[in-house]
């Protein structure tokens, strides 16, 4: 069976990709399967740079096609912050609670109609000796004034979806997987999936 590498150790992300490649009889492997690679430092200043950094680094080491993603929250009232620093907004510890606390503090006094935001995801598909391809997806919302919901992770409890009247942490996981920024980026990737599959199967 052919195998595609997803440059992540996140099991949730891996499952999303597994669903796509299963119909092509392609197995999904993650960085958890290659502990010798270790953590790749995200030194880019854009989502595309970080996604490419991860995908190209792993593709070079393993000499095969690799998919990586970089995603985050963009808040208009904060000039795009936390952006590429979303996971470490309150420090390097990737602490969801502290990140949410800092976000709420920085938005104190901001009117509801000025709290517009979006989740963004960029996927990078890297193959050795070939140009890296990029696919993006977003979902629009508003930052709530308090945490609501227990599903999801990260900023989900604060990301309010007006069309549903719920935060991302309140909607069912199945619905989130349909409308999320990552889901929308994957939909773009699916348009070129046959080409990606060919790169994997010819190895």
Swiss-Prot record:
Binds 1 Mg(2+) ion per subunit. GO terms for cellular component: cytoplasm; cytosol. Substrate binds at residues 8-13, 71, 153-156, 176, 181-182. It catalyses: XTP + H2O = XMP + diphosphate + H(+); dITP + H2O = dIMP + diphosphate + H(+); ITP + H2O = IMP + diphosphate + H(+). It is an enzyme of class 3 (hydrolase). The keyword Hydrolase applies. Its EC number is 3.6.1.66. Pyrophosphatase that catalyzes the hydrolysis of nucleoside triphosphates to their monophosphate derivatives, with a high preference for the non-canonical purine nucleotides XTP (xanthosine triphosphate), dITP (deoxyinosine triphosphate) and ITP. Seems to function as a house-cleaning enzyme that removes non-canonical purine nucleotides from the nucleotide pool, thus preventing their incorporation into DNA/RNA and avoiding chromosomal lesions. This is dITP/XTP pyrophosphatase. It comes from Listeria monocytogenes serovar 1/2a (strain ATCC BAA-679 / EGD-e).
């Amino acid at each position: 069976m052919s195998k595609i590498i997803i440059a992540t150790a996140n099991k949730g992300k891996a499952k999303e990709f597994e669903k796509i490649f299963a119909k092509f009889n392609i197995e999904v492997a993650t960085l958890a399967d290659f502990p010798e690679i270790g953590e790749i430092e995200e030194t880019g200043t854009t989502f595309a740079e970080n996604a490419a950094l991860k995908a190209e680094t792993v593709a070079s080491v393993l000499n095969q096609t690799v998919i990586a993603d970089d995603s985050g929250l963009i808040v208009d009232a904060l000039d795009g912050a936390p952006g590429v620093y979303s996971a470490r907004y309150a420090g390097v510890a990737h602490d969801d609670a502290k990140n949410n606390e800092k976000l709420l503090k920085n938005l104190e006094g901001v009117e509801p109609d000025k709290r517009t935001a979006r989740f963004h995801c960029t996927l990078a598909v890297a193959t050795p000796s070939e140009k890296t391809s990029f696919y993006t997806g977003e979902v629009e919302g508003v930052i709530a004034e308090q945490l609501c919901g227990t599903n999801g992770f990260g900023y989900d409890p604060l990301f309010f979806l007006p069309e549903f009247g719920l935060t991302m942490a309140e909607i069912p996981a199945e619905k989130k997987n349909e409308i999320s920024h990552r889901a929308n980026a994957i939909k773009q990737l699916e348009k070129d999936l046959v080409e990606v599959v060919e790169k994997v199967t010819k190895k």
